[in-house]
C-alpha cells in the first residue's frame, strides 16, 4: 500500500489498523530546537479520542502517545520523530459476522478489489482510528506555527444534520462535546443525537477550520497551490465528501462585484477567497470547511453482497460514531496545520530572502 505519506518537506507517514496492536507515525522534516513533549500532543488527542460523551462511539481508548525518537532533552533534534499509540479496547468478535460480507457505502468492497485481502476488524486501515496519528503530528506543526510564526489554527462544528449554528463564539467551542460555537444550539444537538441513537441511524456534519496570522506568500503554483494542497489534505480525512475554500460553492451565485475581495490601504474588505489568491496565501485568514457523510456502519439492516457476489443482509454490531463529524474538528485542524507547516518550509527554502516594500494588508 502506497499513499501513506503526506507532505514534501514536513512529511507525515502513518501506519496501523483499527484493531491492530498499535498506531504509529513518522514525522520527518521538523526543524531542530522546538520544545516538544508528549503532553503537547496529548491535549489534542484527548479532544479527538473516542468514548468522551454519549454522542460518540463507546470504544474506550486512552490514546496515550509515546515519543520514540527525534526528541532529546525536551527538544526536537531535526531527525525523524517516531510516535506510537497502543490500541487497548478492540472487540474484534463484533465483526466476525461481516468477515465475508461487504458493508454498503464502506471501504470493504473497494479494499477487497484493490488488494485481494482486507482486515475486516473495525475497517482495518480504512478506519478513522488512523486519524489519531494525524492529530499527534498536527500538534507538532501547530506548536511550531504558533510559537515561531504566530499562526493560530482552530476549528468548529458549524452544522450537524439539519441544525446550523448562528453564532461564532470561540470560547464556547471547548465547552461542549460537539465543538459547537453557538451555546443556543447545543441542547438542540443533544436532543437530535439522542433521538438518532435510539433510531440506530447516523447523520453528517460540517466543520469549519480557520488559520489566522498566516503571512502572504505561502503556496507553490501551479500544481501545489496552497488551496489545492489544503483541499487534498482535508479530502483525505475519512468520510469527507466535500471541501470548500472561502465562499466555496456560494460563489456560483455571487456576482463579480460581490465576490472580489476589494483592497484598501487599511485592509481587505472581504474574504471570499478564503485567504488564498492564485494559490498563494494573501495574509488574510485561511478559511476552509468540510462536509462529512453519515457513517454507513449501522445496526439497521442494509443490502450488501458477500465475497461470492450473493445478496446478504448486513448488520454492523460494532461500536461506531452516529456522527463522525463530532470528533472531526481536531483532525481538520491537524491537517491544515500540517499543510501550512509544509508550505512554510518550502517557501523559506526558495523565497526566504524575498523582500517587497508593499505593505501586508489585514482584513477590516
UniProtKB/Swiss-Prot annotation:
Its cofactor is FMNH2. Pfam families: Chorismate_synt (PF01264). Keywords: Amino-acid biosynthesis, Aromatic amino acid biosynthesis, FAD, Flavoprotein, FMN, Lyase, NADP. PROSITE patterns: CHORISMATE_SYNTHASE_1, CHORISMATE_SYNTHASE_2, CHORISMATE_SYNTHASE_3. NADP(+) binds at residues 48, 54. GO terms for biological process: amino acid biosynthetic process; aromatic amino acid family biosynthetic process; chorismate biosynthetic process. Coiled coil: none annotated. CDD domains: Chorismate_synthase (cd07304). InterPro entries: Chorismate_synth, Chorismate_synth_AroC_sf, Chorismate_synthase_CS. The keyword NADP applies. GO terms for molecular function: chorismate synthase activity; FMN binding. Its EC number is 4.2.3.5. It catalyses: 5-O-(1-carboxyvinyl)-3-phosphoshikimate = chorismate + phosphate. Pathway: Metabolic intermediate biosynthesis; chorismate biosynthesis; chorismate from D-erythrose 4-phosphate and phosphoenolpyruvate: step 7/7. FMN binds at residues 125-127, 238-239, 278, 293-297, 319. Reduced FMN (FMNH(2)). GO terms for cellular component: cytosol. Homotetramer. NCBIfam families: aroC, PRK05382.1. Belongs to the chorismate synthase family. PANTHER family: CHORISMATE SYNTHASE (PTHR21085:SF0). This reaction introduces a second double bond into the aromatic ring system. This is Chorismate synthase. It comes from Marinobacter nauticus (strain ATCC 700491 / DSM 11845 / VT8) (Marinobacter aquaeolei). The gene is aroC.
